[in-house]
Design a protein with these regions (language model features):
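N-terminal alpha/beta PP-like core and its mobile active-site loop of ThDP/TPP-dependent enzymes
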Residues: 1-292
């Protein structure tokens, strides 16, 4: 069916399971907000208006950390998109899956120093896993789907999609994403295989596990480091059981905060520049360091 770029964007967000968007409107993104109004009206997507675009990006980051799902934020061109930079950098450093959607001036105005034209894809290249400038409405759906697959897969992180205003108004055929990758070929098939419905976390090699067990058994002063992976995997109980089983002290990273009970006598506190002396000395003294 024929849809505007704005509607294609919203349909793709719905099919990716997005239920909350954080953002702040502006001139170039108005077509998207006009379409968002319909989706918020029927309860499919909730929009949270922030006081500043940086707040929207940080909120999307917080949403991703607390739910384990991809956070989404909207921003307009110029100062709107540049205000996202700190939030994007934070998500990149902390491996938080977010998709930032910005709108730019029309394609005919790109590269002409137009009002509020900013090369946001160039600015964010070092702090995103991938970013896109969508020049044709025909490629919009595939770009959105690929962005979510990239944000989720491997080491999670931020992805940015910049859409010129005219692309949000132009029309193209929209093909809903199939529920299964069966019978789907080409780029869409590859995207389906990388989607959240079909993505499987990597499984450990049992030979490596056996080797680790041998190393632990031979160690006299092992040290466990509780990192962000414990929190993201919600493996708090399993990690604590491991620490208790091998009777190893536990140092905690900033991202691992909350992954190990502070009242457990095995904890040495936070590690690093702002960490405890006990944790940092334990790193120097251990004969086996296990970072999780």
């Amino acid at each position: 069916m024929q849809c505007t770029g704005a509607k294609i964007l919203m349909e793709c967000l719905v099919e990716q399971g997005v239920d909350t968007i954080f953002g702040y409107p502006g001139g170039t993104i108005l077509n998207v907000y006009d379409e968002l109004y319909n989706y918020e009206g029927d309860g499919r997507i909730k929009h949270i208006l922030t006081a500043h675009e940086q707040g929207a990006c940080h909120a999307a980051d917080g949403y991703a950390r607390s739910t384990g799902r991809v956070g989404v934020c909207f921003a307009t061109s110029g100062p709107g998109c540049t205000n996202l930079v700190t939030g994007i950098a934070t998500a990149y450093m902390d491996s938080s899956p977010i998709v930032c959607i910005t709108c730019n001036v029309g394609t005919s105005l790109l590269g002409k120093d137009s009002f509020q034209e900013v090369d946001i894809t160039g600015i964010t290249m070092p702090i995103t896993k991938c970013n896109y400038l969508v020049r044709s409405v025909d490629e919009l759906a595939d770009v959105v789907r690929e962005a979510f697959a990239i944000a989720r897969s491997g080491r999670p992180g931020p992805v940015l999609i910049d859409i010129p205003k005219n692309v949000t108004a132009e029309k193209a055929d929209y093909e809903p994403l199939p529920r299964s990758a069966h019978g789907t070929s080409g780029r869409l098939g590859k995207l389906m295989k990388r989607s959240s419905q079909n993505f499987k976390a990597p499984e450990p090699d049992h030979r490596d596990i056996d080797k680790l067990v041998e190393m632990i058994a031979a160690s006299k002063k092992p040290l466990l480091i509780c990192g962000g992976g414990v929190v993201r995997a919600r493996a708090h109980h399993e990690f604590e059981a491991l620490a208790n089983r091998i009777d190893s002290p536990v140092a905690i990273t900033v991202m691992g905060a909350g992954g190990f009970r502070g009242r457990n006598p095995l904890t040495t506190g936070m590690i690093g520049m702002h960490g405890s002396q006990a944790s940092n000395m334990a790193v120097d003294a251990c004969d086996l360091l296990i970072a999780v």
